[in-house]
A protein has these predicted regions:
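Short, basic phosphate-binding NTP loop
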Residues: 2-108
Length: 108
């Protein structure tokens, strides 16, 4: 279990914007709180923060739809991700999702 953080706190920690598609997130979205972090789309639960990681044979960004279908509170997205991002998904846009994950771990 992760200490509770809201998306706005996370964005401050990572010095990164919170977005919905290409527009800034509204105040309600910024206040969304997540208590768990998951890098595995198969283990996601409602209210989690999804951090899609890239590997040699996969890219977690390919599972953003699965994350939305279980009701995640938001996701980190790599700035260079050119694929589909569900419109309703609140995202924190970072240069590298693995590095951001490490920053979160150090802060908590």
């Amino acid at each position: 279990m992760t200490p509770s953080l809201c998306l706005q706190d996370l964005a401050r920690l990572l010095d990164a914007p919170v977005q919905r598609r290409s527009s800034p997130a509204d105040p309600t979205t910024l206040a969304w709180v997540f208590e768990n972090i998951s890098t595995d789309s198969r283990a996601l639960q409602t209210g989690d923060l999804f951090i899609p990681l890239r590997g040699e044979r996969f890219d977690g960004h390919d599972f953003l739809d699965a994350a939305v279908s279980v009701g995640v509170a938001g996701a980190l997205i790599a700035r260079d991700w050119a694929g589909y991002v569900p419109e309703q998904l609140a995202t924190v846009v970072v240069d590298d999702t693995l590095r951001a994950y490490q920053q979160i771990a150090l802060a908590l």
